[in-house]
Design a protein with these regions (language model features):
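Catalytic core of pol beta-like nucleotidyltransferases
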Residues: 1-24, 33-38, 49-108
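Glycine-rich beta-strand-to-loop/alpha-helix junction loops that act as flexible
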Residues: 28-30
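Short beta-strand->loop micro-motif that forms the acidic, two-metal-ion catalytic signature
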Residues: 42-47
Length: 108
C-alpha cells in the first residue's frame, strides 16, 4: 500500500477513534484486496458497541473530525452495532465479506 493511502488510513482511524467508541475498524474492498484502481475509494466498516447513539449521528461526528483535519478523502464508510455485525457476519452479507476478507485497522 502506498504512503498516501497509509496516511489517509491513519487519519481515518484517528478521526473515528476521536469521534466514536469504536470496537473495531475494518478496511475492505479494493484497497484491502490489493486491487485498487484510479476510481477506487477507501471502504471502511466501523463496529460500534451496542447501545451507542444513532448511527447517522455518529457518522456525522466522524465526518466532522475528518473535516477539521482539512483533508478530503474519497471514503465509503459503513457503521454497525456489534451485535448486528456479529449476527450478520454468518450470512451472505457485507458483514461476512468484511469479517472474512477485511483488514483490521483497529480492535479485536
Amino acid at each position: 500500500m502506498d504512503a498516501k493511502i497509509q496516511n489517509d488510513l491513519d487519519l481515518i482511524k484517528e478521526s473515528v477513534l476521536q469521534a466514536v467508541p469504536a470496537e473495531a475498524i475494518y478496511l475492505f474492498g479494493s484497497y484491502a484486496y490489493g486491487t485498487p484502481n484510479e476510481e477506487s475509494d477507501i471502504d471502511i466498516y466501523v463496529v460500534l458497541p451496542d447501545g451507542t447513539a444513532e448511527l447517522g449521528e455518529l457518522f456525522g461526528d466522524i465526518l466532522m473530525f475528518l473535516r477539521k483535519k482539512k483533508k478530503r478523502i474519497d471514503l465509503d464508510m459503513k457503521l454497525g452495532h456489534s451485535s448486528v455485525f456479529n449476527r450478520r457476519k454468518n450470512g451472505p452479507t457485507l458483514e461476512r465479506v468484511v469479517a472474512q476478507k477485511g483488514i483490521i485497522l483497529y480492535g479485536l
